């Protein structure tokens, strides 16, 4: 893990999703005293800046795997430098980050699982199917396999599973056959070429009926695989819950069902008691350690969606620790096997 150093400027614009609602939900714990807030997906620092401005006594721990976004956030948060700790790490390294800072517990945690506008629009990243660019898709460009390497080197069966599991793509077999045919001729290196392959593989009648871009599901699956998102998310949730102090809150923004499902399950387990069925009363030691704050998942209102269309699919879940002790990890345990 490396501390952020070189600050750089940027003209990129990123509108933090559900910013006002998140601030209101965290205000209960952050409004008084020297509190510690963790932004485990700092990005360009939009949510973090809002927290620091509204709560002048809050100390921020900002974590991100994307060094370029992290340095942009460092420049943005310079006015609050005496209250900010920025760390280059993946969010599932949260316990190690806090240990290095000498923090046993924190008061709030925010995880925004979406890409920033900067990442989507950055030509050299390859996240977007609307711009022709090198197929990279790594949030941390200093390590890991690129999307091009996965496409060109993976077994066809593994690619089919990836598209089905991470993209929920019905035409995974057809798309992978087309990918294999093309890569046998020459490596697939750019997003533009991949979009052409996908578009040609999906029947025209289906393309006309789909409300989204034909490449959307494949690009989502590739991004998830490149960044191991379905490994790090189930790992960070119980670790973040463990480090929340009593009265602390955790807020998670997800953008599709694959992200929302493990969040929903982890939060449901954390808010459940561990007493056997049939007991006339739940012993205090078995009582739920967390309570829900939001009723299910909240969505952005119509005004926000109109202003920031990329927020349309967002789902916000928040729970609060009400008792000390380990949480019920039924689903977290399953994911880690």
Curated annotation (Swiss-Prot):
This is Ribosomal RNA small subunit methyltransferase H. It is found in: Cytoplasm. The lineage of its organism: Bacteria, Bacillati, Actinomycetota, Actinomycetes, Propionibacteriales. Gene3D superfamilies: Putative methyltransferase TM0872, insert domain, Vaccinia Virus protein VP39. It catalyses: cytidine(1402) in 16S rRNA + S-adenosyl-L-methionine = N(4)-methylcytidine(1402) in 16S rRNA + S-adenosyl-L-homocysteine + H(+). S-adenosyl-L-methionine binds at residues 45-47, 64, 91, 112, 119. NCBIfam families: 16S rRNA (cytosine(1402)-N(4))-methyltransferase RsmH. Its EC number is 2.1.1.199. It is an enzyme of class 2 (transferase). Specifically methylates the N4 position of cytidine in position 1402 (C1402) of 16S rRNA. One of its GO terms (molecular function) is rRNA (cytosine-N4-)-methyltransferase activity. Belongs to the methyltransferase superfamily. RsmH family. Its main location: cytoplasm. GO terms for biological process: rRNA base methylation. Signal peptide: none annotated. InterPro entries: RsmH, SAM-dep_MeTrfase_MraW_recog, SAM-dependent_MTases_sf. The keyword Cell inner membrane does not apply. It comes from Cutibacterium acnes (strain DSM 16379 / KPA171202) (Propionibacterium acnes). GO terms for cellular component: cytoplasm. Keywords: Cytoplasm, Methyltransferase, rRNA processing, S-adenosyl-L-methionine, Transferase.
């Amino acid at each position: 893990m490396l501390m952020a150093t070189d600050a750089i400027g940027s003209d990129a614009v990123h509108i933090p999703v559900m910013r006002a609602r998140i601030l209101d939900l965290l205000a209960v714990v952050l409004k008084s005293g020297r509190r510690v807030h963790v932004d485990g997906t700092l990005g360009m620092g939009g949510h973090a800046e809002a927290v620091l401005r509204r709560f002048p006594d809050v100390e921020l721990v900002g974590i991100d795997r994307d060094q370029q976004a992290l340095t942009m956030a460092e420049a943005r948060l310079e006015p609050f430098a005496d209250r900010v700790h920025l760390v280059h790490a993946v969010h599932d390294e949260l316990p190690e980050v806090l240990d290095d800072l000498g923090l046993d517990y924190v008061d709030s945690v925010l995880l925004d699982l979406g890409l920033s506008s900067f990442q989507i629009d950055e030509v050299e990243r390859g996240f977007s199917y609307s711009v022709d660019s090198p197929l990279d898709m790594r949030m941390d460009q200093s390590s890991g396999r690129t999307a091009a390497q996965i496409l060109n080197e993976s077994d066809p069966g593994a690619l089919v599973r990836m598209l089905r599991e991470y993209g929920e793509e019905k035409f995974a077999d057809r798309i992978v056959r087309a990918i294999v045919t093309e890569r046998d001729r020459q490596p697939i290196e750019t997003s533009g070429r991949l979009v052409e392959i996908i578009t040609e593989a999906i029947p025209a009648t289906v393309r006309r009926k789909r409300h989204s871009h034909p490449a959307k599901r494949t690009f989502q699956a590739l991004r998830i695989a490149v960044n191991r998102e379905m490994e790090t998310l189930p790992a960070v949730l119980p670790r973040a819950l463990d480090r929340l102090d009593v009265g602390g809150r955790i807020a998670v923004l997800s953008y599709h069902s694959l992200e929302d499902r493990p969040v929903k399950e982890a939060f449901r387990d954390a808010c459940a008691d561990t007493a056997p069925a049939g007991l006339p009363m739940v012993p205090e030691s078995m009582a739920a350690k967390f309570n829900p704050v939001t009723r299910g998942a909240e969505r952005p209102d119509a005004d926000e969606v109109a202003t920031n269309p990329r927020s349309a699919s967002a789902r916000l879940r928040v729970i609060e620790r009400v008792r000390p002790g380990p949480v019920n990890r039924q689903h977290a345990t399953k994911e880690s096997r």
